[in-house]
């Protein structure tokens, strides 16, 4: 595919105003509600003068303008004063080798998916140049409702100078009764309580596609005009007229693109297009093959587990885009300027009044090697981040593991088919044999979901795609209601895995006969309070048990955690049963196609 327009850069936007999506706004300006003014509690006052200011001297880049400029980037405390060609009179000047860039902004994350508390998450990503994220905390909010949202917003205050901008969860529960057992609920009245908070920047992803098109989410969408919030979309599989209907209702972004057709559709509609590269969804390759440029594009990690943070970061994603032939400034824009414009942030640019978050790289090339990171006007290694304390509920498993059973026989069943590298699943109909409480067919395992909220509900089905899984894997991270999910070929192992959760509470783990390994998730059954290195070590012990008992050499937990999500096509299992998910309809379907054993 020809891409001759890439290397030339796009020039000054004042000369080319069409580069941004329709309805784009200038940095620091909300869609309708006016400027995004961060109160003095969150940004130091601009000094009248003195000797407290500091400046970098060297080459710098703000993607709003074309090319690399030379001069001074000046800040005082945690706030940028601006850039200039002239040496400042009242500033401590630091000569810099390399290129000075704005701190990177991840436009869509679920911090809970890291398995870490937010402060520990921030410590890791800031080393790679990420100084701000737009956090949709709907994982913890699904578990604990308004209490979880209050904790997230309080954490956004406590964690400064790291910026946890908040997207207000708009679909909690994602689906709810009768399709799944849930605990948390966020009504629009609850959302309004937090909508004017200075760290709240958007209405979180609107996952109820049919509800959006039918006007059932209008009250949440109206928060856009009432509070000047961006509205985040979630439209997997929608193209053509259906995509038009959905985005015409109000959503402005989409992070669910995973096919060339979807990426093309979003660009044609002028929707902010997010490209995911995380632990679960890896859409970068398709995006780089499809997109002609990166105007209106943001790179995001979405769900990124601690074990993958050494390999996946915004810095490396930008480098990959440059290596693929995209213009370096456009690639940098996808983690700086574009998120800033999309959400009206005071991050992502080197302009007066914005946060003094600065990244220095050796060059804008495929390596994007970091030489320095400053956050809130301080070197990152000198900053310690905090998060808020809260009594968030742990897992309450009331199902007796001995109750979980399935009659021996040969059946034609609907299997939840895994799609490697994607959170989507397929409906696969096939014959299977259950004998002595074990599935005898290659690449098929039992799938069991029990509620975590003490209601005692559970269901059993089948999953295809875990290969020769010869143990049981269990997780209390199960999107989005976070009930307990287990996969295993033998019911004895499945029961032992449920017993493990009953004994230790929230965790991810593996059980093979008498052996068990797990990572304790003591914060809402989603996150660990332990040191990140300890979490990674325990997680590796779990994976080693899976490898040694099964020969499975890939991480099954990201796939396992999404087989329960009943708002993404095509087939999902919840604690209430098997759910068929289509763009215009969600319904229960039978696990056994004819209701009786074949033999």
Curated annotation (Swiss-Prot):
What is the designated name of this protein?
A: Adenine deaminase
Q: Which GO terms describe its biological process?
A: adenine catabolic process
* Catalytic activity entry: adenine + H2O + H(+) = hypoxanthine + NH4(+)
Q: Which residues form the signal peptide?
A: none
Q: Which GO terms describe its molecular function?
A: adenine deaminase activity
Matching PANTHER family: ADENINE DEAMINASE, N-ACETYLGLUCOSAMINE-6-PHOSPHATE DEACETYLASE
Please provide the record's keywords in A-Z order: Hydrolase, Manganese
Q: What is its EC number?
A: 3.5.4.2
Family note: Belongs to the metallo-dependent hydrolases superfamily. Adenine deaminase family.
Q: Could you confirm whether the keyword tRNA processing appears in this record?
A: no
Q: Give the gene name.
A: ade
Q: Which cofactor does it need?
A: Mn(2+)
Q: Which organism is it from?
A: Methanopyrus kandleri (strain AV19 / DSM 6324 / JCM 9639 / NBRC 100938)
């Amino acid at each position: 595919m020809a891409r001759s327009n890439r290397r030339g850069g796009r020039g000054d936007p004042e000369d080319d105003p069409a580069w941004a999506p329709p309805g784009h706004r200038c940095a620091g300006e909300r869609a309708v509600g006016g400027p995004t003014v961060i109160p003095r509690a969150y940004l130091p006052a601009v000094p009248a003068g003195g000797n407290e200011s500091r400046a970098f001297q060297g080459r710098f880049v703000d993607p709003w303008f074309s090319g690399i400029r030379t001069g001074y980037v000046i800040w005082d405390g945690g706030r940028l004063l601006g850039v200039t060609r002239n040496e400042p009179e009242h500033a401590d000047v630091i000569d810099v080798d390399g290129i000075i860039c704005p701190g990177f902004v991840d436009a869509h994350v679920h911090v809970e998916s890291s398995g870490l508390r937010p402060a520990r998450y921030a410590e890791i990503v800031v080393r790679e140049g990420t100084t701000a994220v737009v956090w949709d905390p709907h994982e913890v909010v699904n578990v604990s409702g308004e209490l979880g949202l209050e904790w997230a917003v309080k954490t956004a205050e406590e964690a400064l100078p790291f910026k946890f901008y908040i997207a207000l969860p708009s679909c909690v529960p994602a689906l709810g009764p009768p399709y799944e057992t849930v605990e948390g609920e966020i009504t629009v009245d609850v959302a309004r309580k937090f909508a004017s908070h200075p760290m709240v920047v958007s209405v979180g992803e609107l996952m109820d596609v049919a509800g959006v098109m039918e006007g059932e989410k209008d009250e949440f969408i109206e928060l856009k005009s009432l509070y000047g919030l961006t509205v985040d979309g979630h439209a997997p599989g929608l193209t053509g007229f259906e995509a038009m209907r959905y985005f015409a209702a109000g959503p402005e972004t989409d992070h669910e693109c995973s096919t060339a057709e979807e990426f093309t559709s979003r660009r044609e509609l002028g929707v902010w297009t997010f490209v995911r590269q995380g632990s679960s969804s890896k859409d970068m390759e398709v995006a780089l093959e499809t997109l002609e440029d990166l105007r209106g594009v943001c790179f995001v990690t979405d769900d990124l587990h601690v074990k993958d943070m050494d390999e996946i970061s915004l810095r490396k994603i930008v480098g990959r885009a440059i290596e693929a032939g995209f213009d370096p400034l456009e690639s940098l824009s996808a983690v700086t300027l574009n998120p800033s414009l999309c959400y009206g942030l005071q991050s992502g640019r080197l302009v007066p009044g914005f946060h003094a978050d600065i990244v220095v790289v050796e060059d804008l090339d495929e390596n994007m090697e970091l030489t320095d990171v400053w956050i809130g006007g301080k070197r990152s290694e000198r900053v310690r981040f905090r998060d808020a304390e809260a009594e968030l509920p742990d897992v309450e498993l009331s199902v007796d593991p001995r109750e979980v059973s399935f009659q021996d026989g040969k059946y034609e069943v609907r299997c939840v088919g895994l799609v490697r590298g994607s959170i989507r699943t397929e409906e696969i109909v096939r014959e299977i044999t259950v004998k002595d409480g074990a599935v005898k067919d290659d690449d098929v395992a039992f799938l069991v979901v029990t509620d975590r909220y003490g209601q005692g509900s559970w269901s059993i089905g089948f999953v295809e795609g875990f290969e020769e899984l010869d143990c049981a894997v269990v997780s209390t991270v199960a999107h989005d209601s976070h009930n307990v999910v287990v996969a295993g070929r033998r019911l004895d192992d499945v029961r032992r895995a449920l017993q493990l959760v009953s004994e230790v509470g929230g965790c991810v783990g593996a059980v093979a006969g008498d052996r068990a390994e797990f990572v304790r998730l003591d914060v809402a059954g989603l996150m660990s309070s332990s040191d990140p290195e300890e979490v990674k070590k325990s997680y590796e012990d779990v994976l080693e048990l899976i490898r040694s008992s099964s020969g499975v050499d890939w991480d099954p937990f990201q796939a396992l955690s999404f087989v329960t999500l009943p708002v993404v096509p095509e087939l999902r299992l919840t604690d209430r049963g098997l759910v068929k998910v289509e763009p215009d309809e969600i319904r229960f379907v039978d696990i056994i196609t004819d209701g009786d054993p074949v033999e």
